[in-house]
Amino acid sequence: MNLRLSCLLFILVTSLPAGRCSIGNKGISFETCTAIEGLCFFGCKLGWVWIAYCNNIMSCCRKDTDFVLPQTKGI
């Protein structure tokens, strides 16, 4: 029972719009975050800059244009 519950929890957590999600997504747009040209994630992606909180647990991130790392050019 505990193993099934753990697997279900793992699948639910990995399907959330996280910055390092295995499914790949473009984030969630909240009005407060899109007003400052950002997207909401559960942690910022590589090459994105943290701006503010979207709500209690999500972070508003914006793509970094000043210090672009070579690893992030393909993202």
Swiss-Prot record:
Subcellular location: Secreted
Extent of the signal sequence: 1-21
Domain of life: Eukaryota
Listed GO MF terms: lipopolysaccharide binding
Keywords assigned: Antibiotic, Antimicrobial, Defensin, Disulfide bond, Secreted, Signal
Pfam family, one: DEFB136
Induction trigger: By androgens.
GO cellular component, one term: extracellular region
UniProt GO BP: antibacterial innate immune response; antifungal innate immune response; defense response to Gram-negative bacterium; defense response to Gram-positive bacterium
Cysteine disulfide partners in this protein: 33-60, 40-54, 44-61
Functional note: Has bactericidal activity. May play a role in the antimicrobial protection of sperm and urogenital tract epithelia.
Family assignment from sequence similarity: Belongs to the beta-defensin family.
Protein name as it appears in the record: Beta-defensin 42
